[in-house]
């Protein structure tokens, strides 16, 4: 069995995520507490109720009140990563490890923490800054993201190029798998492109609930500020191979990690290439750790005869341990 751990990105979050894990496992609770201490945010309340409040050192206090803070980029990134890293603690306790780690967008950070290239403290702190900058350092305007299904990425690139030449702003942002590409841009360009994609044979187009044109040049100001935070961090050699989002290759010891992770904000995510590399490496068991089932869903569309495992609650975690031990 050759295992890859996969860490989800934004869009997979939902209120209540991780609550049963927090209540059952002391190790999970400790990870939430550590992340809360680093960020100053009560991450348990953020995940379980969708409400952001300051962390004052207490355990989670049960409440029926809910809010919409979890969907804000500055909160989503640290919340999803914390849940993923908490689940990892239970897997490690059961001596379940991966040969390869990777993630989608923010998911690359828990992958690097698992791989040993980044400490827990630095990773969570970086995600706090990254989420804040990606939300607050956008050019003025209304933006949107659109998933395009059933149209070749080369055709999508061609349509985007033509619209850009006409003065519109729209670019490919996520190459999820061979048959699905996400584009980012201003709202009017997205609306126009949506019609053109369908006219050119797209089976489906879906507008995504995101707050900005992520993974495009629109985030250049955010990138330039973020690199200052990255330069404060020391990256380690690591002990598990981690695949980069920007080009679908492994990190190596000669890489400039600061430069790559800064570039990550303004570059498309090449998860299609990530899948191809895992296939070439002979991975046969893919374990998605955290909320949602997006990444295993992409792999299911591309690869046959592989094991797909999702871990997002107590039941799925216990089942995974039985399979993987």
Description of each model-found segment:
Residues 1-156, 285-319:
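FabD-like malonyl-/acyl-CoA
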Residues 10-12, 37, 41, 58-61, ...:
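Alpha/beta catalytic cores of group-transfer enzymes, especially the acyltransferase/condensing modules
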Residues 76-78, 213, 268:
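Glycine-rich phosphate/pyrophosphate-binding beta-alpha loops
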Residues 92, 198, 279-282:
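Non-catalytic positions within long, well-ordered alpha-helices that form the structural scaffold/packing
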Residues 163, 320-325:
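Short amphipathic alpha-helix with an adjacent loop that forms part of the alpha/beta core around
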Residues 207-210, 279, 312:
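Short glycine-rich catalytic loops that host catalytic nucleophiles or stabilize transition states
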């Amino acid at each position: 069995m050759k295992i890859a751990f996969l860490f989800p990105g934004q869009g997979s979050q939902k209120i209540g995520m991780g609550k049963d894990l927090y209540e059952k496992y002391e190790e999970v609770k400790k990870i939430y507490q550590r992340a809360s201490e680093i960020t100053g945010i009560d991450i348990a309340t953020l995940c379980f109720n969708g409400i952001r409040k300051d962390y004052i050192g207490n355990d989670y206090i049960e409440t029926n009140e809910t809010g919409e803070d979890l969907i804000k980029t500055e909160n989503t990134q640290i919340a999803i990563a914390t849940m993923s890293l908490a689940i990892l603690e239970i897997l490690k306790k059961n001596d379940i490890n991966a040969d390869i780690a990777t993630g989608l967008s923010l998911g690359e950070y828990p992958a690097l923490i698992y791989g040993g290239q980044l400490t827990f403290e630095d990773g969570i702190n970086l995600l706090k800054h990254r989420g804040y900058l990606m939300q607050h350092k956008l050019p003025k305007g209304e933006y949107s993201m659109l998933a395009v299904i059933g149209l070749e990425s080369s055709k999508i690139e061609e349509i985007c190029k033509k619209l850009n030449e006409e003065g519109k702003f729209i670019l490919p942002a996520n190459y999820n798998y061979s048959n699905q590409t996400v584009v980012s841009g201003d709202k009017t360009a997205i609306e126009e492109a949506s019609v053109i994609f369908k006219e050119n044979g797209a089976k489906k187009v879906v507008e995504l609930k995101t707050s900005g044109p992520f993974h495009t040049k629109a985030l250049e100001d955010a990138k330039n500020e973020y690199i200052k935070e990255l330069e404060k961090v020391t990256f380690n050699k690591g002990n598990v191979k981690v695949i980069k989002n920007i080009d679908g290759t492994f990190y190596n010891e000669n890489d400039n990690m600061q430069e790559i992770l800064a570039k990550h904000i303004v570059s498309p995510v090449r998860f299609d290439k990530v899948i191809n590399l895992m296939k070439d490496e002979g991975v046969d068991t893919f374990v998605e750790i955290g909320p949602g089932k997006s990444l295993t869903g992409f792999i299911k569309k591309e690869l046959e005869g592989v094991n797909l495992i999702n871990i997002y609650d107590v039941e799925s975690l216990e089942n995974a341990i039985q399979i993987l031990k």
